[in-house]
Amino acid sequence: LNLKINKGNFHVVAWDFRVKKNSERKLRELKRLGFNANIIGQNRYGLYQVVFESFPTREQAIRKLYKIKKEQNPEAWILVKDLN
């Protein structure tokens, strides 16, 4: 489980997975596509959250989200969470 992330509290979430192995597979795929992707842990429902990238500002995250929604995953969304 890779918990190292970019500094930032604004995370563009790609997918949530119940099975850890599935989240790791998606992580590898996103990294191959050039994203600075990470698994940021499990949410309160026990789902592993895979993020495309994390950003220090809301504006940066929103800009990336628009591009990702158009090109990768129309269901991507922004999670605001301090992981430190």
Task: Name each region found by the language model.
Residues 1-8, 18-84:
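Extracytoplasmic
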Residues 15:
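Conserved beta3-strand ATP-binding lysine motif
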